[in-house]
Amino acid sequence: MDYRVLLYYKYVTIDDPETFAAEHLKFCKEHHLKGRILVSTEGINGTLSGTKEDTDKYIEHMHADSRFADLTFKIDEAESHAFKKMHVRPRREIVALDLEEDINPREITGKYYSPKEFKAALEDENTVILDARNDYEYDLGHFRGAIRPDITRFRDLPEWVRNNKEQLDGKNIVTYCTGGIRCEKFSGWLVKEGFENVGQLHGGIATYGKDPETKGLYWDGKMYVFDERISVDVNQIDKTVIGKEHFDGTPCERYINCANPECNKQILVSEENEEKYLGACSYDCAKHERNRYVARHHISNEEWQRRLNNFKDVPEHTHA
């Protein structure tokens, strides 16, 4: 594999995010990198892809800046670019929690758990493992026994916690996310809310899966990633498929976006059922006048109507 995907973040003061973003974008484009980087006065949050040579130059460039001299990169091998374009954008936050009173993870955050310590927490009956990701991420893969918050946006997690305090009160709480950045701020919020014994998986699932001792043990399914790959393996010991196909409930790890551009819901669908149900999550979405699957495959009106009849077999998916 000639390409690599880098995942990283750091909470550090960046005085002029706009200027930094413009200069950073120029460097990335000059080195043929593609990805998404968010920059704020509170730090940087990025994931990008490129050849080994170009990503090495990027790592060297970042480490040469005193603000990022100790920056840790999580690295995956890849067969090609994992992104189509390169974006570097200034933002108010590098991960959107949208709290009324913002949390500074450099001042307040949960205890860091190493992969080995997190594995022990997974085995501890007195510890609650809380997934800090979205529901569709959890549904593709998660740590065994972890709590699944019913959210589609990270900013909704605090409200979910307040509505489900009985699951957490009086317990040791350890939270986890993809690379660790969401938990930095979220675990700090839990501490500020008065929860005691709050921890977080340092480096996230990505680090746990590559750890030579834990080897991703107790992870079921795949890890959702926000790039062209969609998902990656974590458990090196005992691989399982836990995702369920949207229409027939069979094991599935293939995510698509609903073909209705006004819905765009992410659903697990086999190639066969994507074709059968016109790339949509429901009858309402399949018959939408701007169905992207219909347009992309140049499906005739007659064939469109024929496939819409397939929804008679799945009445529970009449509406989005």
From Swiss-Prot:
Cited InterPro entries: Rhodanese-like_dom, Rhodanese-like_dom_sf, Rhodanese_C, TrhO, TRHO_N
Class in the EC hierarchy, top level: oxidoreductase
UniProt KW Phosphoprotein keyword: no
Listed transmembrane segments: none
SMART domains: RHOD
EC number: 1.14.-.-
Alphabetical list of SUPFAM superfamilies matching this protein: Rhodanese/Cell cycle control phosphatase (SSF52821)
Gene Ontology biological process terms, A to Z: tRNA modification
Single GO molecular function: oxidoreductase activity, acting on paired donors, with incorporation or reduction of molecular oxygen
Residues forming the catalytic site: C177
Keywords associated with the record: Oxidoreductase, tRNA processing
The Rhodanese domain, residue ranges: 123-217
Keyword flag Aminoacyl-tRNA synthetase: no
Similarity remark: Belongs to the TrhO family.
PANTHER family: RHODANESE-LIKE DOMAIN-CONTAINING PROTEIN 7-RELATED, THIOSULFATE SULFURTRANSFERASE/RHODANESE-LIKE DOMAIN-CONTAINING PROTEIN 2
Protein name: tRNA uridine(34) hydroxylase
Source organism (scientific name): Staphylococcus epidermidis (strain ATCC 35984 / DSM 28319 / BCRC 17069 / CCUG 31568 / BM 3577 / RP62A)
